[in-house]
């Protein structure tokens, strides 16, 4: 199952992706799914089993994540 992290800015999405990949996590930039938001924007998709690591990196790097979702 994949999870999605959403962001208010493109900069935060790209910074999140780079930070996660730098420690070997499988993260990819994706459009925000319509069921989450009708607005345009970027999100990051990652395996749900990495949820704890992903949240830890976001907190450590002070990355502003709008929300986390399970798909």
Where are these regions (language model features)?
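Amphipathic, hydrophobic secondary-structure cores in small proteins
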Residues: 1, 10, 26-43
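Absolute protein N-terminus
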Residues: 1-2, 71
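Short amphipathic alpha-helix segments
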Residues: 9-25
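Preference for short coil/turn "hinge" residues that link or interrupt alpha-helices
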Residues: 23-25, 29, 56-58
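C-terminal structural segments of small proteins and small subunits
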Residues: 39, 43-71
């Amino acid at each position: 199952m994949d999870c999605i992290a959403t962001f208010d800015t493109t900069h935060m999405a790209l910074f999140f992706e780079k930070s996660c990949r730098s420690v070997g996590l499988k993260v990819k930039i994706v459009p925000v799914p319509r069921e989450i938001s009708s607005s345009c924007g970027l999100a990051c998709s990652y395996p749900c089993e990495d949820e704890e690591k992903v949240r830890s990196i976001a907190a450590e790097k002070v990355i502003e994540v709008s929300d986390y979702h399970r798909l």
